[in-house]
Amino acid sequence: AQAIIPNVKEKFDEYKNNGDYVILTKDTHHSDYADTSEGRKLPEHCMYGTKGWEIVDELDYKNLDSFMVCCKSTFGFDDWDWEETFGIAYDSSLLDIEIIGICTDICVITNALLIKTYYPEAKITVDASCCAGSTPEKHKAALDVMESCQINVINRN
């Protein structure tokens, strides 16, 4: 994940220069994590209030003009109602959404497919150079699946 930080910093600059609205989803787990389905299968991570829960300092997202941080307790953010949740009126055919982040094979793919399900006419792009998977093989497999689900994947190196 550390290897993508320079690319993500550049992407944030691009978003800022374009005046884009940025939504950051943030894994947020609590003391009961080990008792959850996810917690029984994955090691403890992103525990609320710890350094591992924070967005890394190198990504100065607060410099973005328009952003929102949405905490999520599992792989995907489950409230992608643009108008109700974010106060953004939309015509789904006009939505142009780019997704970046970690973990490609868990969180990125889940959110991409959720958004595609809610908004099938939206243009959804995943920038592979700004994503990291749990392994290189799973990263590639997730990108392949997203492409097969009509999600545009760019910068596959």
Residues covered by each model-derived region:
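Short glycine-enriched, charge-decorated loop/helix-capping segments at active-site entrances
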Residues: 1-3, 39-46
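Von Willebrand factor
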Residues: 14-32
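Active-site-adjacent betaalpha module
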Residues: 7-20, 43-157
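Metal-dependent catalytic neighborhoods of phosphoester/phosphodiester hydrolases
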Residues: 32-38
